[in-house]
Amino acid sequence: MSATSSSGDVKKFQAVPKPTSNASPPPASSGFNARTLWPDLIETPENQWVFECKDIIEKIGTNGPIAVEIKKNMEKCLMYFYTLKKKLNLFDHTYTASCILFYRYWFIYGIPTAITECIHISQGILVTACKTMENNRPIEAYIKATCEFLMQNIPSLKSRTNIDKLKWEFRDKLVTNEKKILCLFGFDLNISNPKELIEEVFSGYYRFNRDHNLPENFKKAFPKILQESRNFMVQAVTQPVSLLCDGYTFIVLSLIYCGLEYKKLVDKDFRYPKNFFKDRFPIEVTPENFANIFTDYKLLEENFFNLKSNKGAKLQIDSSMIDSVIDESGDVENEVSEISDPFNYELIKSGEVKEEFLNHIETRVKDLLDKAKQESMKRKAKDPIRTPDAKKPKI
């Protein structure tokens, strides 16, 4: 290709050079500010997601038949989260995040009366939780597991629904519902997930470096209490407790409950070390406050779902019982100002670690390596590599 210049000489077009990394972007047109519409740093909003027990219960409504139907649909949605957690091999904290987001959605917007529409919303919530908490799964995995759940748990669908048609319906609505849910939440993905927070607050580093000076008898008992606390949260999140307290309060609630159970069943002299909660959580822990939360928790169980995981009479915990396992006494005047930051940089900036922590990491790495080797050997045993047939001699 060529072009004629004004002087009549024929010159060839030269290739346009590619801009370097230092090239400045083209000037924006007047009235358009790219930084306003798409800033370098997007700050997600944070809303208040803690409500009064009275308001949570009243949200069900006073119309008996409608309230029963709503609770029935809600229970199916919670069952859906648990079933897909098993089928898709999701983490516990993804399951708890799904339940937390579901209750927030229900409290603000309510849920449809049709169960299929409820599952549509639940599927969008599950995908959002999965993307927020861990690696996402292929869209086919969500669709297949969701449709199987519907066919197994809603008998009326079996006779009048084509499974392939159902899959296409859920595929079409998945992305739409996911966008809808994000917009309705105002992109507020600050889940304050207690199952995730407890792993961070009591991670290996803090256990071996921050908590090394705890009493030996407590250090032996605490891993068992911590495990029971994890189980407590996974079970408790099926009731709308996440609307009653934030993530850190939820963790303290579980540790107090499991500490009382340990005191009753194992060691009658058990007690958390002095200011154990004050030094680790950014909240004020008092017996009176948490006794009220346990009372509200019991009311939620009575008004919502009758589940096997319900604690029932075990939630009748008063302030004197809580006071018997915690020792948060201190300077009342400075109590608020001394509330701890669980991720205080001052505790870790030196970079020094205990030898026990290094040994712990080495043991964990070896365990993971051995596990990977065993799984690899199992796969090879199930699918042995076929040896190629011997070449036949040419005739």
UniProtKB/Swiss-Prot annotation:
GO terms of molecular function: cyclin-dependent protein serine/threonine kinase activator activity; cyclin-dependent protein serine/threonine kinase regulator activity
Gene Ontology CC terms: cyclin-dependent protein kinase holoenzyme complex; cyclin/CDK positive transcription elongation factor complex; nucleus
GO BP terms, alphabetized: DNA-templated transcription; DNA-templated transcription termination; positive regulation of DNA-templated transcription, elongation; positive regulation of transcription by RNA polymerase II; sno(s)RNA transcription; transcription elongation by RNA polymerase II
Modified residues (Phosphoserine): 24
InterPro entries in the record: Cyclin-like_sf (IPR036915)
Cellular compartment(s): Nucleus
Record key words, sorted: Cell cycle, Nucleus, Phosphoprotein, Transcription, Transcription regulation
Keyword hit for Cytoplasm: no
Region (Disordered), start-end ranges: 1-31, 372-395
Record function comment: Component of the BUR kinase complex involved in transcription regulation. This complex phosphorylates 'Ser-120' of the UBC2/RAD6 ubiquitin-conjugating enzyme (E2), leading to monoubiquitination of histone H2B, the localization of the PAF1 complex to the chromatin, and the silencing of telomeric-associated genes. Also required for histone H3 'Lys-4' trimethylation. May phosphorylate the 'Ser-5' of the RBP1 carboxy-terminal domain (CTD) repeats. Necessary for the recovery from pheromone-induced growth arrest in the cell cycle G1 phase. Also required for vegetative growth itself.
Quaternary assembly: Belongs to the BUR kinase complex composed of SGV1/BUR1 and BUR2. Interacts with SGV1.
Protein name per the record: Protein BUR2
Species of origin: Saccharomyces cerevisiae (strain ATCC 204508 / S288c)
